[in-house]
């Protein structure tokens, strides 16, 4: 029977913390710590797309992964012009995984780059990077919503990842470096909130493995990922961000003072935008004989044009 160095049971993951806004200059960021593995994840938004997507009306999510020189026991040379092959492969894995979280058309013609830099490596760096990058991505999207650059969130799925393996003939989850270096079977699992697999990377390092062992690893991984997703939600909630986007509420007005006032009132529950920010800038003929009637005409017109629930300015009548 395997005895793990830190006393964990085979099915138990390491302690996890996720600190949002770790890099204040980034559009979104977090520091994720899984045991002694520590990874900074940042998200940067650019208002353009790669050449192969220009004019197609959709955005792009990509990633870069690197390890700081002192992140392991021996100094790792920094990437130069020729990037480390392992780092390139992991960068592609992170990018593929996080694109599964986003409706690229709803993102619009902009690029979000997720940079994952390993401060300290003790196994599971790529899976920690994916889990942390999801949080950084949500933070960046929240900023775009707050700035009125997006009217609805393009986030469609929650993504997290964990490592599993067979060590001393025992299936276990969330391997540290010592366990990973002698694992007989090594696997990385990426899943969404529905329990669907986004990516599986698995190999028999020291021997082949059975269907029963594979099933045990998948079950352990799914349980571990569910716990990681709760950590993601908790860290985002602490900074008043949420994976499920706040609905958009349009105000039938261009009065910025009124918009700010309603954002202050409803901002915890709705993304409040002006009718111009929602794409409506046409004159409205107010033909009713009462204040409430004209407010209704204005709100109904804006709601019909934008397809979004609309709040009449001073009357606070709501139309959907």
Predicted regions and their residues:
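Conserved small/polar residues in nucleotide/adenosyl-binding loops
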Residues: 319-320
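Catalytic metal-binding/acid-base residues of hydrolase active sites
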Residues: 316
